[in-house]
């Protein structure tokens, strides 16, 4: 997952998830932010990742599995408006937390 970063916006009633590609020291958006559970963010990310040229199937599986784990973690901890960022980072080292509201 070193080539990809998952970005989240942690909200009380939703979690927004997007995927960026890491090239050198720069991040380039691969997907829009999708809000779970407002929409089926996992399915929307899958559709966008399917349309990405040059994205290997194994990388897509790793990304989507990580998204599943992040959504599960959010569901278990959504009562926490401000998650413990060091704990979040220890569970998901490739995650970028864009904000907590």
UniProtKB/Swiss-Prot annotation:
- What Pfam families does the record point to? PSRP-3_Ycf65
Query: Taxonomically, which superkingdom?
Result: Eukaryota
Q: What UniProt keywords are attached to this protein's entry?
A: Chloroplast, Plastid, Ribonucleoprotein, Ribosomal protein
Q: Name one GO cellular component term.
A: ribonucleoprotein complex
UniProt-recorded name of the protein: Small ribosomal subunit protein cS23
Could you tell me where this protein is found in the cell? Plastid, Chloroplast
Question: What family does the entry list?
Answer: Belongs to the chloroplast-specific ribosomal protein cS23 family.
Give the species.
Answer: Cyanidium caldarium (Red alga)
Gene name tied to this protein:
ycf65
Q: Does the keyword Zinc apply?
A: no
Provide the GO MF annotations for this entry: structural constituent of ribosome
Disulfide linkage = none
């Amino acid at each position: 997952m070193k080539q990809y970063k998952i970005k989240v916006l942690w909200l009380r009633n939703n979690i927004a998830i997007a995927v960026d590609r890491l090239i050198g020291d720069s991040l380039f958006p691969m997907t829009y932010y999708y809000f779970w559970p407002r929409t089926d963010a996992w399915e929307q990310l899958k559709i966008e990742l399917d349309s990405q040229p040059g994205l290997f199937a194994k990388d897509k599986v790793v990304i989507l599995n990580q998204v599943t784990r992040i959504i599960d973690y959010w569901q278990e901890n959504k009562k926490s408006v401000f998650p413990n960022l060091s704990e979040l980072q220890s569970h998901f080292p490739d995650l970028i937390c864009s904000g907590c509201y």
